[in-house]
Amino acid sequence: YTETKGKTDDVMQSSESSTGVTNSITDRKESIRQGVTVLSENLEEAAHHKVDPWTAVQAYNFGKAYIDYVAKNGGVNTVELAKAYSKNVVAPSLGNTSGQTYTYYQPVAMYYGGGKLYTNGGNIYYAKEVQFNLFLMRMFSRL
């Protein structure tokens, strides 16, 4: 849900990790299989590097190299660390060398940082959004 809100067939936006091309997976079950595989690999890598599991979740958005970055910078995913990685690693690798930002109007993002994201820099609030969505699922499952 965090990725696409269920609006595309690649519900977990896992195409890039599989083929390197966005939206190349057109089957929801395949998207989920690929997404679970990537998250599982990230969790194993996070355990190997002795970082928190939320680093693995954030790496689902940024890519596996984020796990090593966190391991070298305190071992715990934070919005501040994700912001630095987005600005200094992800965004420049995809052409944003000027630090250009835009506003991401999403409640969790607005709460944690005014909604600012770096253009081509991934989502620095991704792990927090997943945490919030898990909270909502737990809350509504009790009704």
Predicted stretch roles:
Residues 2-11:
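Conserved alpha-helical segments that form or flank metal/cofactor-binding pockets of metalloenzymes
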